[in-house]
């Protein structure tokens, strides 16, 4: 038991279920604004939390508008999680390639 707890402190793992629920609650508020999310990935490394998520916005939004929404989402996630490192990736919701999130290399269009 002691060795497992010691090793857990050295190994990265995903965030605990209660933190994932907090993330989902934040994202649910933004879904009501027409924003979609996928490819949510979390990691706990020591005392530091990391969150990565793809943010799908209408393709006719300006870069500024999409960026402003992404900044709001990142700030709220950091507030809820206590200074986590949050990374978002903006994608147009209409683009079928936006739905491919499992592969590191995307096929050429």
Please report, for each region that a protein language model flagged, where it lies by residue.
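Alpha-helical transmembrane segments and adjacent TM-loop junctions that form the membrane-embedded core
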Residues: 1-109
């Amino acid at each position: 038991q002691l060795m497992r707890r010691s090793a857990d402190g050295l190994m990265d793992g995903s965030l605990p279920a209660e933190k994932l629920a907090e993330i989902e609650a934040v994202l649910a508020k933004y879904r009501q604004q027409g924003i979609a999310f996928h490819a949510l990935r979390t990691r706990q490394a020591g005392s530091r939390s990391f969150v990565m998520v793809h943010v799908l916005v209408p393709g006719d939004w300006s870069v500024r508008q999409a960026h402003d929404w992404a900044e709001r989402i990142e700030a709220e996630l950091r507030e809820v999680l206590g200074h986590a490192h949050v990374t978002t990736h903006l994608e147009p919701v209409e683009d079928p390639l936006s739905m491919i999130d499992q592969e590191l290399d995307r096929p050429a269009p």
